[in-house]
């Protein structure tokens, strides 16, 4: 139900009511998310929010807060409502149609940086989404050049905005690519990196509501066995990689990792990295040429 009507409420009262509503909506991090929404609606910093708990929130800000709270109650990702998501030390723009960056994908960036030289190189990020992987690599390697490919126009536009805000457009080319095999440009890369859709089609309905009902299905659905994009990437990567170049992929579970480890005789497996749950989350191969 909406926040109770009447005179302007104090921040303390608003926080208490909103936390109860999000808890009833099965939002796991209700207390923290209410504070994020209050800061977003009011313009207060987190410190100011605490310092002014007994002050009323003006009517306009309270209306904004109510609208945003309803969106979160419906299951819409908090990142879409706030308009941004953290990734490594960045705060990236996100919104409907764009996969929300995950902490696990930071491991993919760490592995890429550990395998690449400090001097100039060219890489491709297929399925770039918000551009989180490419932006992180470009910031860490000032002489690198990135080719960002994405099949979702909304996500490609979001990646462009993020790179523009970070001053990285001069070292990047963004292209629309429906599949790994139809890239509309020629490239010879030192690295191909991807966090592709890898969830089996039949498992989509079992995902959390904020993922299942709001995030783009094309960024999640990996086909009947979750492996469609992996097969396409292994097939297409030799078109882009120089001999000795690296293919770097994120995967969803240990079963996929085991299937992928020796997937192609054109690549030599290098190593994998475990995530916070001790599951192999990303793996690297070297292209034989």
What are the roles of these predicted feature ranges?
Residues 224-286:
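Conserved Class I SAM-dependent methyltransferase catalytic core
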Residues 2, 36-114:
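Conserved AdoMet
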Residues 1-42, 47-49, 57:
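Non-catalytic accessory regions of SAM-dependent methyltransferases
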Residues 198-229:
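Mobile active-site "lid"/loop adjacent to the S-adenosyl-L-methionine
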Residues 26-27, 141-143, 164-169, 240, ...:
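Short helix-capping segments at alpha-helix termini
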Residues 93, 173-175, 270-273:
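General small-molecule cofactor/ligand-binding pocket signal
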């Amino acid at each position: 139900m909406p926040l109770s009507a009447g005179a302007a409420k104090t921040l303390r009262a608003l926080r208490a009511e909103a936390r109860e509503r999000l808890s009833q909506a099965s939002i796991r991090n209700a207390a923290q998310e209410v504070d994020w929404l209050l800061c977003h609606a009011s313009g207060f910093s987190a410190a100011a929010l605490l310092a002014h708990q007994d002050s009323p929130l003006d009517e306009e800000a309270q209306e904004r807060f109510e609208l945003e709270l309803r969106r979160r109650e419906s299951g819409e990702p908090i990142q879409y409502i706030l308009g941004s998501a953290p990734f490594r030390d960045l705060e990236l723009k996100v919104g409907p149609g764009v996969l929300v960056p995950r902490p696990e994908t930071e491991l993919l960036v760490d592995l890429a940086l550990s395998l690449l030289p400090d001097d100039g190189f060219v890489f491709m990020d297929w399925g770039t989404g918000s551009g989180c992987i490419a932006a992180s690599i470009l910031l860490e390697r000032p002489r690198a050049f990135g080719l960002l490919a994405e099949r979702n126009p909304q996500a490609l536009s979001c990646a462009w905005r993020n790179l523009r805000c970070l001053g990285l457009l001069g070292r990047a080319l963004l292209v629309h690519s429906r599949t790994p095999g139809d890239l509309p440009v020629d490239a010879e890369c030192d690295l191909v990196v991807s966090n592709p859709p890898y969830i089996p089609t039949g498992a989509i309905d079992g995902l959390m509501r904020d993922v299942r009902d709001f995030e783009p299905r094309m960024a999640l659905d990996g086909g009947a066995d979750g492996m469609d994009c992996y097969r396409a990437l292994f097939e297409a990567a030799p078109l882009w990689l120089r001999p000795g170049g690296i293919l770097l992929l994120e995967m969803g579970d240990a079963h996929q990792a085991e299937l992928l480890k020796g997937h192609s005789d054109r690549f030599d497996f290098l190593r994998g990295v475990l995530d916070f749950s001790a599951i192999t989350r990303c793996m690297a191969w070297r292209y034989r040429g």
